[in-house]
Swiss-Prot record:
Protein name, per record: Mechanosensory protein 3
GO biological process, one term: mechanosensory behavior
Metal-binding recorded as keyword: yes
A matching Pfam family: LIM
CDD domains: homeodomain
Role description: Transcription factor. Specifies differentiation of the set of six touch receptor neurons (TRNs). May positively modulate expression of both its own gene and also of homeobox ARX homolog alr-1 in TRNs, forming a positive feedback loop with alr-1, thereby restricting the variability of expression of mec-3. Required to determine the identity of ALM sensory neurons, acting by interacting with unc-86, thereby preventing unc-86 cooperating with pag-3 to induce BDU-neuron specific genes. Binds cooperatively as a heterodimer with unc-86 to sites in the mec-3 gene promoter.
SMART domains assigned to the protein according to its UniProt record, in alphabetical order: HOX, LIM
Organism: Caenorhabditis elegans
């Protein structure tokens, strides 16, 4: 934008250049369509404007020092980038100004700070927080919505979502009991966190073997006393899979039936395997400097600080042999 000064006496060169030019139309304001007699003239794209007519088309604020021109319309800096910026906020779908504070994800999405919210619950997402990115819909959501809820009537659907457990390097990791009714329907999925570093999001089914499939209850629950549990734990530490003869000796020593002892060892071996998978799963996050989200179970919460107490209550199941 240039500002011209109309002087009473013009130079000879300007007079020569002005020959054949329609001064009446040249000095007509492009905004109000009135003739300009002011001392100063604003000129943009070979169009003249009154000083007072140079205003933002949107907010009508006067633009004395700087303005933007697009398709015959004048804008202030804020509204020009809001309507015509090549970078668009994935949240509000409006343009991004060079002075705006934004979050830029590795997936190519850009969000205003105030627009960086979960698309499902509307919660504001903080810097460094792990998020789920949908490249197709260009949305983000918080980890509490993973895995997504599925229709109970759909084939292979799961009744409710199971979240991923959290871990801390300051406190020891307590063994988590894994719900045996959890189906292995989820697959490994890659996501991107708030800083754009790739990490693989695993569900529990990726770490469980065939023994984690849902088993049907067929007998009453049996509670083992502490002295009986101590004998079984001692045997398990020496022989995780005792023979039939060893189980018969345990039945005489503890007063429990061979059926109960056999089921207890089956369940204990299964818990040990899943505990090993769970530790590998948590180590997978810690090696990458990531913190998994908290875990919740569909069934009633159980005390995970005492693994022996957890193994004291179990269900009688069919023989594997």
């Amino acid at each position: 934008m240039e500002m011209l000064e109309s002087k009473p006496l013009s130079a000879i060169s300007m007079v020569i250049d002005s020959i054949g030019v329609d001064h009446e139309n040249q000095n007509k304001c492009n905004c109000c369509n009135e003739q300009i007699y002011d001392r100063y003239i604003y000129r943009m794209d070979n169009r003249s404007y009154h000083e007072n007519c140079v205003k933002c088309t949107i907010c009508e604020s006067p633009l004395a020092e700087k303005c933007f021109w697009k398709n015959g319309r004048i804008y202030c800096s804020q509204h020009y980038y809001k309507d015509h910026s090549i970078h668009r906020c994935a949240g509000c779908k409006k343009g991004v100004s060079p002075t705006d504070m934004v979050y830029k994800l590795k997936a190519g999405l850009v969000f205003h700070v105030e627009c960086h919210c979960c698309s499902l619950c509307g919660r504001h997402l903080s810097p460094g927080e792990q998020i789920l990115v949908d490249d197709t819909m260009m949305t983000v959501s918080c980890m509490s919505h993973y895995p997504p809820q599925m229709d109970d009537n759909a084939p292979g659907a799961i009744g409710s979502a199971v979240d991923i457990p959290s871990c801390s390097t300051e406190n020891p990791i307590a063994p988590y009991p894994i719900d045996e009714s959890f189906s292995s329907a989820f697959q490994v999925k890659k996501e991107v966190d708030a800083y754009g570093y790739n990490f693989e999001h695993y569900s529990f089914s990726d770490f469980c073997d065939d023994d984690s499939r849902m088993l049907k209850r067929r007998g009453p629950r049996t509670t083992i006393k502490q002295n009986q549990l101590d004998v079984l734990n001692e045997m398990f530490s020496n022989t995780p899979k005792p023979s039939k003869h060893a189980r018969a000796k345990l039945a005489l020593e503890t007063g429990l039936s061979m059926r109960v002892i056999q089921v207890w060892f089956q369940n204990r071996r299964s818990k040990e395997r899943r505990l090993k998978h769970l530790c590998n799963y948590l180590r997978h996050y810690e090696q990458r400097g990531l913190i998994p989200p908290p875990i919740h179970f569909r069934n009633e919460e159980m005390d995970t600080t005492d693994f022996n107490a957890f193994c004291g209550n179990f269900e009688e199941e069919d023989d594997e042999d």
